Amino acid sequence: MPDKFAALRKKYLSSFPAKLEGVEDAWEKHDMKLLHDLVHKLAGSSGGYGFDEISRQCKNILSQLHESKNTTTNDIERAINQLMQLLSSAQ
C-alpha cells in the first residue's frame, strides 16, 4: 500500500508546475474568484497528499482573501509568493 500512495503522491507532485502557473496567472489578472477556487482546491488536495505546509499556506491565503478589507494587497501578494516558492521546491 505505501508504494501505491508514493506513486500517487509523485503523480500529484508532477502537477505542481501547472498549479503554480494557474495561481500566478489568476493573481496577475486580478481574477480573485479563479484565484480563490484554485487555492481552495489546492488547500484540500495538498493536505491529502501530505503536503501540509502547502495546505496551511493555501488556508492562510484563503483567510486573507475572505478578509480582504483588513488585508493589504501586499500581504496577499507576499502569501502567494510564499505559496509559489513552496510549490516550486516541493519534493
Regions found by a protein language model. Give the residues of each.
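Amphipathic, coiled-coil-like alpha-helical segments
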Residues: P2-E21, S45-E53, N60, S68-Q91
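A short hydrophobic/aromatic micro-motif that marks alpha-helical segments and, especially, helix-coil
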Residues: L34, L65-H66
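Solenoid-repeat scaffolds in large eukaryotic assemblies
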Residues: L34-L35, I54-S55
